[in-house]
Amino acid sequence: MSQTRAEATPASDLTPVVAVLGATAAAVAIWVVATLAGAELTVSFGPGQPIQKITVVNVVVAALVGSLAGWGLLALLRRFTTNARAVWTVVATIFALLSLGGPLSTISSAGTKAWLVAMHLAVATVTIVGLRRTRGR
């Protein structure tokens, strides 16, 4: 009987790019499903404040900003700490949970809040899982 060992394949240099684009694609996919399902993705940030429609551009920009910020923080931590991945994962998870305050604090329907929370969680999950796989300490 022969024994085979699975070798861990190193992450590609493209892994962070794939993570950022994947997080963005996940948010856009949820936005598309919500829109096709007839969800009215509009929010207001307080009484008397204007109602804002959540567009695909809003979704793309928010996902890119969040995931690129995560990538930047991970790169900085790798430069200055020896346990960057662990520290970054904790910080990223805290920021992901705090980001839920945005959609949950808006004046919008429960359905809109649910769709927005789903987008936030999708971006956070893909970003955290994807960037943890990148090379580095």
Question: Which residue stretches match the model-derived regions?
Answer:
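Membrane-water interface at transmembrane helix exits
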Residues: 30-38, 74, 78, 131-135
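Internal alpha-helical transmembrane segments of multi-pass membrane proteins
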Residues: 16, 75-96
